């Protein structure tokens, strides 16, 4: 049995057509089903529907053989027990700092609100900047507006939400896309099967990119 961990939303929507190229199609619509384990048209392949931030954990611990996770999630939660063989070039966005439009650069210790705590610590450590990290799980844009933080670090797609709240994107930390990740033990035990899937997905990505 080959188990693939996916999260609902943009990543799932963009991944399903790629899996279909490999003949892997869910037997019911994951967006409408309440099931978290979904069979596919291949009897020995199933999908696990999990939170985006949990995909690396499921794969690393062998609960799933493969998964699809955003690079932002992999940067934050680590991927030491994973192979990352393929950039699927889907769900593309940017991980950036942002602050109030026109606000002067704060002097001294910086207050940064984000859910990407580990990324923020590494980023500012590399700059030699002292920061206080404030962990939030949502509505990041609010933090600078009410003086909870000087800046935020968040995923930016169009930037419309930032602008609607009087903020502007500032420093680019990383360009983000979703990656195929593979459990190391699974890669050894089911090497031919998984490598064939990787190759098929790579061809699908390249074909789509050329198109």
From Swiss-Prot:
Pathway: Amino-acid biosynthesis; L-histidine biosynthesis; L-histidine from 5-phospho-alpha-D-ribose 1-diphosphate: step 1/9. Pfam families: HisG. SUPFAM superfamilies: Periplasmic binding protein-like II. GO terms for molecular function: ATP binding; ATP phosphoribosyltransferase activity. InterPro entries: ATP_PRibTrfase_cat, ATP_PRibTrfase_CS, ATP_PRibTrfase_HisG, ATP_PRibTrfase_HisG_short. Keywords: Amino-acid biosynthesis, ATP-binding, Cytoplasm, Glycosyltransferase, Histidine biosynthesis, Nucleotide-binding, Transferase. Coiled coil: none annotated. Its EC number is 2.4.2.17. GO terms for biological process: L-histidine biosynthetic process. It is found in: Cytoplasm. GO terms for cellular component: cytoplasm. It catalyses: 1-(5-phospho-beta-D-ribosyl)-ATP + diphosphate = 5-phospho-alpha-D-ribose 1-diphosphate + ATP. Belongs to the ATP phosphoribosyltransferase family. Short subfamily. Lacks the C-terminal regulatory region which is replaced by HisZ. Catalyzes the condensation of ATP and 5-phosphoribose 1-diphosphate to form N'-(5'-phosphoribosyl)-ATP (PR-ATP). Has a crucial role in the pathway because the rate of histidine biosynthesis seems to be controlled primarily by regulation of HisG enzymatic activity. Heteromultimer composed of HisG and HisZ subunits. This is ATP phosphoribosyltransferase. It comes from Pseudomonas putida (strain GB-1).
